[in-house]
């Protein structure tokens, strides 16, 4: 398996990436393809792809919260007929190494298993991240805005900390969430979801296993 960084001018490869992307995520969690292309052009987003025998089998998007200590794992997906082959683990390991070289925490927005009608899938995804070195930012009730104008998604925040950091100040996490909402979702100022998230952030936020 080969994992490489994909550039905006690789049109045929991008078409393959976007096909996996659209088949892997629900509409309320997907940015438009045009938005992703703009982010790649402006170097706010970094894209990696995994190939086996020249076939695209997995993708990983990282969003750089410039000027902060965080990289967001925006999207990670494996082509449906190639799941269960350790491709996700290999991609995630590659992304962790990239974050380490950038000297940044690798952050994830992960669906909360206490909500939704697909709990087994949510638990499986959360367990995947935990098994591969990610920890939970304790008790934060994160909400992903609906990207298609329908319903928001209840989530938790996880991360692979740099330098084994085990605690953050509440103000640092509030600033992080504010930046996520502004830079990824175009939401700033007063917002009900943002206010609800902030109300769940304590003075000190510890990093723990979730399961």
Residue positions per predicted region:
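Conserved active-site alpha-helix within GNAT-family acetyltransferase domains
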Residues: 113-138
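A structural signal for short, well-ordered beta-strand segments and their strand-loop junctions
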Residues: 49, 72, 106-109, 136-139
């Amino acid at each position: 398996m080969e994992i490489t960084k994909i550039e905006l001018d690789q049109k045929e490869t991008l078409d393959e990436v976007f096909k996996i992307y659209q088949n892997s995520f629900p509409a309320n969690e997907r940015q438009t393809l045009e938005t992703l292309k703009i982010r790649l052009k402006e170097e706010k987003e970094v894209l990696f792809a995994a190939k086996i025998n020249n076939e695209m089998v997995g993708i990983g998007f990282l969003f750089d919260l410039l000027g902060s200590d965080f990289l967001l794992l925006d999207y990670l997906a494996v082509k449906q007929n190639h799941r269960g082959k350790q491709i996700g683990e290999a991609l995630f390991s590659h992304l962790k190494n990239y974050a380490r070289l950038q000297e940044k925490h690798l952050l994830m927005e992960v669906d909360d298993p206490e909500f939704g009608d697909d709990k087994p899938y949510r638990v499986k995804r959360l367990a995947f991240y935990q098994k591969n070195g990610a920890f939970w930012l304790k008790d934060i009730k994160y909400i992903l805005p609906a990207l298609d104008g329908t319903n928001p998604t209840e989530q938790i925040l996880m991360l692979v900390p740099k330098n084994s950091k085990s605690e953050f100040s509440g103000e640092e996490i509030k600033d992080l969430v504010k930046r996520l909402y502004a830079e990824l979702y175009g939401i700033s100022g007063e917002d009900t979801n943002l206010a609800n998230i902030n109300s769940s952030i304590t003075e000190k936020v510890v990093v723990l296993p979730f399961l």
